[in-house]
Curated annotation (Swiss-Prot):
This is Dicer-like protein 1. ATP binds at L128, D129, T130, G131, T132, G133, K134, T135. CDD domains: DEXHc_dicer (cd18034), RIBOc (cd00593), SF2_C_dicer (cd18802). Mg(2+) binds at E1283, D1392, E1395. The lineage of its organism: Eukaryota, Fungi, Dikarya, Ascomycota, Pezizomycotina. One of its GO terms (cellular component) is cytoplasm.
Length: 1591
């Protein structure tokens, strides 16, 4: 464990606690220290890594503190991504692994939508560059067509399906996977190999038609289906032609259209056509007319070409690669090599080798002699011997007349094989390579030298011939070349099938090669034209044309492979070759001609982005006004902003929403706009000039109004309003406190009750007994705790005596109702008994009289652990006075060495020389002698290393010198005994699990003392330290509540005041400095109290304060902010009563006693608390008050309301009881107006639907009044105030339900599942289910469509869930209630009106909370009867999501989300005021990858997690490892990592204006363990190093 903020880790804390101890023979504590010290564990490198990350993060914060403190430091999601990439200029050039297919359908670009919309209306050919998303448009269109077809089938029409046609078999699987990942419909892929045996099976294709929606196949498949009439063209709804430029002449694309498409006379039955290509023509003819070629393509496909402008294209692809030409010396014709000549003599006339000889003759000139010889080596591979024989034999079999000649050819072929195998191939040298090949090696060496510098290179070398690709790859594998280019990892990619004897491959091999290229295993492909189009090859940063392209489209497509930033497109041309020079320039000319032609298409066929900026930029008539004094400028576009800001400063009624209204009407010459300002504006309207577009007309009107306002002095020289609206004064106040900012405070260690000493007149008894007495190993009887004042009864709590449930027992602390007036003798007697217990059992010898004791212990008699004492009047009757008398008269039992056997049974023995040795005698062992060896298994003492291991020496604990002078009796009897346990913290379950139980030993009693206390009393007295610790903590907690005037039961008070770790409030982190055995902490109560505090202050604000929703939020922030709670807690000294330390074996004794012998007791009266922890305790006390009030015979909220008033000291919350809320409510004026008929009708409809009739219909109408609806129509404000109220009410009722239904769940679980219950998705679902959306009143044109769409969607999901239940054999009403999770977020108004309705219901019923509970029970609770179905809902939260991605998906163990406080303004007032911001960063392998700045740690972590999710969600593990150099192994993840947070910043301010779903905190550990498991594991680690039972 590492050290945070100067706090010692548990290991070090334990060490420091013991290091300064001195050996004390009279102390039992020393033995614990000696025997419980664990073996050193292995060094924990993870903790070292954490500390290194912490240091790196703090250094980064310091280096960037000024920039982070600026207002603009809070980055947007995009800027966070840019920042991440800016740290490594080559990040985007890393190879990209094949990942689960991206759902690109979710975020199309604007031009894609426009092309899609066009394709929906008519047949279209989309002309777009490689990598610009043509397939996405096709998928959008496919989905649209399928949806249309589904609708048509519903009407009884014949089923039709979609065909996606590709030109290459290799593209079938690729496009099938891509489409299947982006469509929720059945998709299959077919090519010749899959249906070769099915051509005569019509049934196969009939089944295909019924089961599939999309078929991806080679065009030949569809053609043959249509040809054989397995399908007809009318059964096809859409045909997508990939690489549509192939549709010419007799290509199968063209034949499908000519032979089948045109044969269907009914145009309505013809399928829609969509073509995709990078260029509409594919020809080498440079003289061809683009108009004619494109016209032919359009005519053939019966489609229109559509494209996008160059400007939008550049926005998509960024910048094109930098094109360069590398020239090589002229290649001269070379003679065949010696190997080739010898082989020609042997097999030169055989037709099987003709193609290889042709390739070798080409290679010797084009590539060089080495490559020509290498070709023969590749042809005559060892594994090809059998194939060669078979092919020669096959040739001979086909011509029986040439048997002799064939035999001779076979012999020659074998001789040729032997020649090649024995040939000595020279290494590739400059002389054996052509100038062209040599130039390629130079280029590759130059490019891959960047890889050595840390820049990843992905390269494709395009060639024309298959054998060229194979030979170049073989060349680069040679040691001589690898020395020059060590980072190159090559492979060839060629078309499937055979190309001579060397260049062949399979489709499977193609896929593997491309996959390895994505993975980064290969970084250089030598490829033929197969890599130019279609195949999903990741973008590269180097593309080399070894052989120049033959057509313009090849040029465009191969260039399109270089899509990365700072890419290079290299053309290799022969020096002085006019043909190469012509093609070098002609391709650019041809491309530009194609672009010019496409841009010359009609305007409706060029998709351009219609933005305001474009409209303004294209119109030079717009005006710019420059303010003379400040030089501020006012443009058309900015005038819209200036006007909106001005209106925001106008005075308004609390419920009034001010806005700017525009009217644009067509006039002669264009459009003219007019602007209208609210009635409170000094100027009401202005009219602009006539412009060519509506947008310009609107801007002109705003511009004219701004000029009028400036001229009338309503705008200053900086174009700011002079009518300053007074915003809420504390809107930007720093209200949060840090959970990591810790201070040392005084801590109450003893209750005030113990301070009362002196003469006493009466005593009150509390019986301490066990519910399961058998758990304690030994028989026991209750003991009595006698106090000067009556003690309250506390709830039972568990003690853990050992391992397993059988060793667990609850303690019952039963106060007796009647006091007892003891005599002086009796007081001194029980005082002596108490001191005897301290001396004999706990090795502490105190000097005290009865007047010094705050409490006494007394043995019991005549009662057992389960005895009913309710009728007992006088406690004196159950005290064992005989035992008291014995302890008063003598401190030990006399021993004469000749006692009978019965004497040695059931007595308690202590060692006066070693306080750690206590024993329970069991029986005498006459068969053993003191000189006998100690039997095996006896626990070894600490002081007999240098003595003989006899029973006598075992019994004597003197040091060596003292032992030598001691003469022991050799005839004394040996006693069998059991070693008494030294464990004191019986409250700690983990410590109990480590207990070994009773241990047998053998003693002689000469040097030991036999106690007067009976064994059964001793056993119960052993439990007293744990009991008194819990009792004292309870009393101190109760005192805190009494000081605040809150009558909270003692048990609940203790829970509310208990903080058991330094980061109790951080549920997503492993506990730090965990204090075991303290019982329940305040977390659950704080969760409950926080929610009630929000509800209570919301009701008070709605009741008393007239203001808008923003002002409500500000006021509520002031009331419930942690800073406010902290201040009042400190004023009340609440921090002194917080219980933050676990049981300490040295501090539980009564205060004020004089210690005569034994280790000195410690006084630990200080503790360090975080500011937020103190504020959390305040909320926990509110939660405790709430539970107390709800537990009354008549459940109410009065005590909780009083607690809110006490804790907040707010001027807006002075209520002492629930009834005070409604008593303070005054009906607003707008509710006093008689309702209209429309409002009454709404009231009736809601009555029929909901069962409740509103007393005030106008209040109900208000719940459905959208802010866009003008108030002057009905003089009813919008629902925003009611929504503010209803939001808090629904939060409270949901939290109350979860809290009571799941008493064993921690706040982390409660928060995560509350997210589901109060999410906008769910509330929107309920609103639609109740039909509330039909009652919404608004004036937003787009809102209606959004509501309708979402309502239909959620209704459909509900119906599907019902049908699924029926299909599963369930009742329809038992459908799965989590169907709404899959629905996207609704329009915001839908959850708003649900909350507003609940708020209105609450107000209309006179603040009757039971009405809210009734609404919850009927309409919300049924969805959450089984909460387990929402267990994964929280995984959508960014912090949880990114943690899962990095640690689980990527397996990285060096990931941190860290936060740090910084001054709000390091150069200004922030240094003076102490105002802070919080910066959160995502650190991976010690570097900050992205960051965010916010007002609190909670929101900063949320923001940076969103950035990280955006970056890493679609990244593959391989790309992650390459990008960050991650080499983490599974064993690295030992649970000591995950979401680590700097322990200095975690502020929690009030929620933003619109509530968001409460951010869940991450619970994912990289080991898959929950935080609860981590806490338990941490607890065990701590207890391993604290006191334990045995030596």
């Amino acid at each position: 464990m590492e050290v945070h903020d100067g706090l010692k880790s548990p290991d070090k804390a334990a060490k420091s606690r013991y290091d300064d101890d001195r050996i004390d023979q009279d102390s039992e504590d020393e033995a614990v220290r000696l025997v419980a010290n664990p073996d050193p564990s292995k060094p924990r490198k993870i903790s070292e890594r954490k500390r290194a990350d912490q240091a790196a993060f703090e250094s980064w914060v310091n280096d960037n503190k000024i920039r982070l403190s600026l207002p603009s430091a809070t980055k947007s999601r995009r800027s966070g991504i840019r920042e991440l990439f800016s740290s490594d200029e080559t990040l985007e050039t890393r190879p990209t692994r094949t990942r689960p297919r991206e759902r690109v359908i979710e975020g199309p670009r604007e031009y894609q939508i426009e092309l899609f919309e066009r394709a929906k209306q008519k047949n279209t050919i989309a002309v777009l560059d490689t990598g610009t998303g043509k397939t996405l448009i096709a998928i959008l269109l496919i989905r649209h067509i399928i949806e249309l077809e589904l609708g048509a089938r519903w009407q009884g029409r014949e089923k039709r399906i979609t065909f996606f046609l590709v030109d290459k078999v290799a593209l079938v699987r690729q496009q099938t996977d891509h489409i299947r990942a982006n469509l929720d419909f059945p998709v299959t892929g077919l090519h010749g190999d899959t249906v070769r045996n099915l051509w005569y099976s019509k049934e196969y294709f009939e089944k295909l038609l019924q089961e599939q929606e999309v078929v991806v196949c080679t065009a030949e498949i569809l053609y043959r289906c249509l040809h054989r009439s397995y399908l007809n063209i009318s059964q096809v709804s859409l045909v997508v032609f990939d690489e549509a430029h192939h549709a010419k002449k007799n290509h199968v694309y063209a034949r499908i259209i000519k032979d089948f498409y045109l044969m269907e006379e009914d145009c309505q039955k013809r399928p829609r056509i969509f073509g995709m290509t990078a260029s509409p023509i594919d020809t080498k003819d440079t003289c061809i007319s683009y108009e004619r070629a494109t016209h032919e393509l359009e005519s053939l496909l019966h489609s229109e070409i559509a494209t996008i402008s160059d400007r939008d294209l550049l926005k998509v692809i960024g910048s094109r690669p930098q094109e360069v030409r590398k020239s090589y010396a002229r290649v001269l014709r070379q003679e065949n090599t010696e190997l080739c000549n010898q082989l020609r003599e042997l097999v030169g006339n055989h037709p099987l080798f003709k193609q290889t000889f042709d390739s070798a003759e080409f290679a010797v000139t084009e590539l060089g002699a080495w490559c020509a010889d290498k070709l023969w080596e590749l042809c005559f591979r060892e594994e090809a011997v059998s194939t060669l024989d078979g092919r020669v034999e096959g040739s001979r079999a086909r011509d029986p007349d040439e048997v002799g000649e064939s035999s001779h050819e076979v012999s020659n072929a074998r001789e040729a094989l032997s020649l090649v195998q024995q040939w000595s191939f020279s290494p590739p040298e400059d002389g054996s390579l052509s100038t062209k090949t040599h130039k390629l090696i130079e280029i590759l060496a130059e490019c891959f030298s960047q890889a050595s510098a840390g820049n990843a290179i992905q390269c494709i070398v395009f060639v024309k011939r298959r054998d060229t690709a194979v030979l170049l790859n073989a060349l680069c594998e040679q040691a001589e070349i690898r020395t020059k280019i060590p980072d190159l990892k090559g492979a060839f990619l060629i078309g499937a099938g055979r190309g001579g004897n060397a260049a062949f491959t399979t489709t499977r091999q193609q896929e593997q090669t491309v996959s390895r290229f994505r993975d980064g295993e290969i970084n250089c492909l030598f490829a033929t034209s197969i890599a130019e189009e279609g195949l999903d090859i990741p973008g590269c940063n180097v593309v080399i044309r070894f052989d120049l392209h033959g057509t313009t489209i090849q040029y465009i497509q191969s260039r399109g492979r270089a899509r990365m930033r700072n890419s290079w497109f290299i053309h290799m041309t022969e020096f002085g070759n006019p043909e190469h020079n012509r093609r070098w320039f002609q391709d650019r000319v041809n491309e530009q001609k194609m672009r010019d032609f496409c841009l010359s298409l009609p305007k409706d066929r060029i998709m351009e982005k219609a933005e305001v900026d474009d409209v303004l930029r294209g119109d030079q008539s717009q005006k710019i006004f420059v303010v003379p004094g400040s030089k501020a400028s006012l443009t058309f576009k900015q005038s819209l902003v200036v006007l909106a800001e001005f209106v925001a400063t106008l005075p308004a009624r609390p419920d009034e929403i001010l806005s700017v209204d525009y009217t644009v009407v067509p006039v002669f010459g264009g459009f003219q706009g007019e602007v209208y300002l609210p009635a409170s504006s000094p100027l009401r309207s202005a009219m602009g000039g006539v412009y060519r577009s509506k947008q310009l007309a609107k801007c002109a009107a705003a511009y004219a109004m701004c000029i009028q306002l400036y001229n009338s002095n309503y705008l200053d020289d900086h174009l700011k309003s002079t009518l300053a609206k007074v915003l809420p004064a504390m809107r930007n106040a720093r209200l949060a406190v840090s959970s990591k900012k810790r201070k040392s405070y005084n801590m109450r260690t003893k209750p005030v009750l113990w301070s009362e000493v002196g003469p006493l007149t009466e005593l009150y008894a509390m019986v301490l007994s066990l519910a399961q007495p058998g758990a304690a190993y030994y028989h026991s009887r209750p003991i009595l705790l006698l106090t000067r004042k009556p003690l309250p009864e506390i709830a039972q709590f568990p003690l853990f005596f050992g391992k397993g449930s059988s060793r667990r027992s609850n303690v019952r602390c039963i106060p007796l109702a009647h006091p007892w007036s003891p005599t002086t003798t009796q007081v001194e007697g029980i005082c002596a008994f108490t001191l005897c217990i301290f001396r004999d059992i706990f090795s502490k010898d105190f000097q005290a009289s009865g007047t010094d004791m705050p409490y006494f212990l007394a043995p019991s008699t005549g009662i057992e652990h389960g005895t009913d004492l309710s009728s007992l009047v006088n406690p004196e009757r159950i005290i064992d006075w005989a035992t008291v008398h014995r302890t008063t008269t003598t401190d030990r039992v006399p021993y004469n060495f000749n006692e009978p056997d019965e004497f040695f049974q059931d007595k308690y023995v202590s060692d006066p020389f070693d306080g750690s040795r206590k024993f329970f005698m069991r029986k005498v062992r006459r068969d053993l002698k003191p000189q006998d060896k100690v039997p095996e298994g006896v626990p070894a003492p600490s002081k007999w290393r240098a003595v003989e291991h006899t029973i006598l020496n075992y019994s004597v604990s003197l040091w060596k010198k003292s032992r030598a002078g001691h003469n022991s009796r050799q005839d004394q009897p040996v006693v069998e005994a059991e070693l008494a346990p030294l464990r004191r913290n019986l409250l700690d379950e983990t410590d109990g699990e480590n207990s070994t139980g009773p241990q047998t030993c053998y003693l002689v009693l000469e040097t030991l003392l036999i106690s007067q206390i009976p064994v059964d009393t001793v056993v119960m007295a052993y439990t007293f330290p744990a009991i008194i610790y819990r009792l004292e903590n309870s009393l101190i907690s109760l005192e805190a509540c009494q000081n605040l005037g809150l009558d909270i039961p003692i048990d609940i008070a203790l829970i509310a005041m208990t903080k058991d770790s330094d980061n109790s409030d951080d549920h997503d982190e492993a506990p730090i400095n965990f204090q075991s055995g303290m019982g329940q902490n305040y977390e659950r109560l704080e969760f409950l109290g926080d929610c009630f505090l929000k509800m209570a202050t919301s009701i008070a604000l709605y009741t008393l304060v007239e203001g808008d929703e923003f002002e409500y939020h500000v006021e509520r922030m002031l009331d419930i902010c942690n800073k406010n709670l902290l201040n009042w807690a400190l004023e009340s000294n609440l921090q002194e009563h917080i219980r933050s330390k676990s049981f300490n074996r040295r501090t539980w004794y009564p205060p004020g006693l004089k210690l005569l012998k034994g280790k000195k007791t410690e006084v630990d009266d200080e503790h360090a608390l975080g500011d937020k922890s103190i504020a959390d305790v305040c909320e926990a006390l509110i939660g405790a008050a709430y539970l107390t009030a709800q537990a009354q015979s008549s459940p109410n909220f009065d005590l909780a309301v009083k607690a809110v008033t006490v804790m907040t000291h707010s001027k807006t919350h002075t209520m002492q009881a629930w009834s005070d809320y409604y008593a303070s409510y005054q009906c607003p004026e707008w509710l006093s107006t008689p309702p209209s008929q429309t409002q009454l009708e709404l009231c009736s409809q809601i009555k029929n639907k909901m069962g409740y009739r509103f007393k005030n219909p106008r209040l109900l109408r208000c719940a459905f009044m959208h802010p866009s609806y003008p108030r002057q129509y009905e003089n009813i404000p919008s629902y925003q105030r009611l929504e503010f109220l209803g939001d808090s009410l629904l939060d409270m009722v949901c939290v109350d339900y979860l809290f009571k239904k799941h008493p064993d769940k921690d706040p982390q679980w409660l928060t995560e599942h509350k997210m589901a219950m109060v999410s906008n998705q769910f509330f929107g679902c309920v609103a639609v289910g109740l039909g509330f959306h039909r009652h919404l009143i608004h004036m937003q044109p787009a809102l209606g469509g959004s509501i309708t769409e979402w309502a239909e969607l959620v209704t459909k999901k509900r119906e599907e869930a019902r049908q699924l239940a029926v299909r599963r054999g369930q009742r329809e009403e038992d459908y799965a209630r989590d169907f709404w999770i899959e629905v996207h977020h609704p329009p915001k108004c839908l959850p708003d009106i649900l909350e507003a309705y609940v708020g209105a219901l609450f107000v209309d019923t006179g603040y009757d909370y039971s009405a809210v509970v009734g609404f919850f029970d009927r309409h919300i609770k049924p969805y959450f009867a089984d909460m387990s179905i929402y267990d994964m809902y929280s995984s959508k939260h960014p912090v949880t999501h990114i943690t899962s991605i990095i640690t689980t998906q990527f397996g990285c163990s060096s990931f941190r989300l860290m936060v740090h406080e910084i001054p709000d303004d390091v150069q200004g007032e922030g240094l003076v005021t102490g105002a802070v911001k919080v910066v959160a960063a995502c650190m991976i392998h010690g570097e900050v990858r992205c960051h965010a700045v916010a007002a609190s740690g909670r929101y900063a972590k949320l923001a940076v997690a969103k950035q990280a999710v955006a970056i890493y969600e679609d990244m593959s593990p391989t790309e992650f490892r390459l990008r960050h150099g991650c080499n983490c192994k599974p064993e690295d993840g030992d649970g000591d990592h995950g979401v680590l947070v700097d322990h200095r910043a975690d502020c929690e301010p009030e929620e933003p204006l619109r509530k968001q779903d409460p951010p869940a905190k991450s619970v994912v550990d990289v080991d898959g363990k929950t935080i609860a498991e981590m806490r338990l594991r941490h607890s065990k680690q701590m207890n391993d190093q604290e006191e334990c039972l045995s030596w």
